[in-house]
């Protein structure tokens, strides 16, 4: 299902400086400045149709140490549409980011190699605004823009993190012993999701053996 005016464009860059790579992305889902240009007497900042996101990060290595730091931000209602079938998703899954929209995210990854041992620590902190019952503050891309909680299709005054303020924390620590044809690994993961409505914490442990190249997975 398609309709005119529903487009998404993006740009990216990367700059290599010695052993470091600086990178970023900019995405525009919708940008409505005509109301301001026409001196609309009802115009205010935070118009919900100004939908965009961006990413800034750098990664590199120093001797046996590798590192990555990244910041991501997506404004409320981005990737959504007034017609739900036209949102940016596939098989009821968000294509761009698991959090949908309306979030700020900081990621840090540090790795260290010594002999046949690899160590990796990954941390993620996300600040988002979720919906309470019967509301739509722009995080859920599977709701219609016309149902925006602050004015529907004429929604002004929106800001990143509006709604039920929620902090998501994720920590992963991995140790890998590299043998001739397989890796023996152990992982411990901590997940915490906290807001005024909930406080959920989960801990996961994993031990296993994997061989390459079929199970070599990198998420960053």
For the regions a language model picked out, list residue spans one by one.
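Exposed, low-structure sequence patches enriched in small/polar residues
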Residues: 1-220
């Amino acid at each position: 299902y398609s309709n005119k005016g529903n487009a998404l464009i993006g740009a990216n860059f990367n700059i290599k400086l010695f052993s470091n790579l600086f990178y970023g992305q900019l995405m525009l889902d919708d940008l409505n400045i005509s109301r301001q240009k026409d001196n609309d007497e009802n115009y205010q900042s935070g118009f919900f149709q100004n939908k965009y996101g961006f990413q800034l990060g750098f990664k590199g290595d120093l001797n046996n140490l590798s590192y990555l730091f990244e910041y991501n931000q997506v404004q409320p209602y981005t990737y959504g549409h007034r017609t739900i079938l036209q949102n940016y998703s596939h098989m009821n899954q968000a294509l761009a980011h698991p959090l949908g929209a309306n979030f700020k995210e900081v990621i840090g990854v540090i790795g260290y190699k010594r002999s046949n041992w690899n160590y990796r620590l990954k941390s993620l902190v996300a600040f988002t605004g979720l919906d309470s019952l019967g509301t739509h503050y722009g995080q859920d891309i599977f709701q219609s823009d016309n149902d925006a909680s602050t004015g529907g299709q004429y929604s002004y005054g929106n800001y990143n993190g509006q709604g039920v303020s929620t902090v998501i924390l994720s920590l992963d620590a991995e140790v890998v012993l590299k043998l001739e044809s397989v890796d023996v690994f152990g992982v411990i993961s901590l997940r915490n999701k906290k807001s005024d409505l909930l406080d959920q914490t989960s801990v996961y442990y994993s031990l296993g053996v994997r061989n390459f190249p079929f199970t070599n997975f990198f998420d960053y």
